[in-house]
Swiss-Prot record:
This is Stress-induced protein KIN1. Residues 1-52 are annotated as: Disordered. The keyword Transferase does not apply. Residues 17-31 have a biased composition (Basic and acidic residues). GO terms for biological process: cold acclimation; red or far-red light signaling pathway; response to abscisic acid; response to cold; response to osmotic stress; response to water deprivation. Keywords: Repeat, Stress response. Residues 1-13 have a biased composition (Polar residues). Residues 32-45 have a biased composition (Low complexity). One of its GO terms (cellular component) is cytosol. Induction: By cold stress, abscisic acid (ABA) and water stress.
Length: 66
């Protein structure tokens, strides 16, 4: 193999490895974002549930929940 072909081959290998690493990092970032989204969604539900409980408490104490 000529030196030019060898260098081109090695450059192709390096580019392929870099692309694979970037794909792995993107997958990890997607997984982290999905996990954060699920956590935020659960936190939002908890806040909503707590607020609803607070409203019901006030209604009970003020006699509006009849």
């Amino acid at each position: 193999m000529s030196e030019t072909n060898k260098n081109a081959f090695q450059a192709g290998q390096t580019a392929g490895k870099a692309e694979e690493k970037s794909n792995v990092l993107l997958d990890k970032a997607k997984d982290a974002a999905a996990g954060a989204g699920a956590g935020a969604q659960q936190a939002g539900k908890s806040v909503s549930d707590a607020a609803a409980g607070g409203v019901n408490f006030v209604k009970d104490k003020t006699g509006l929940n009849k």
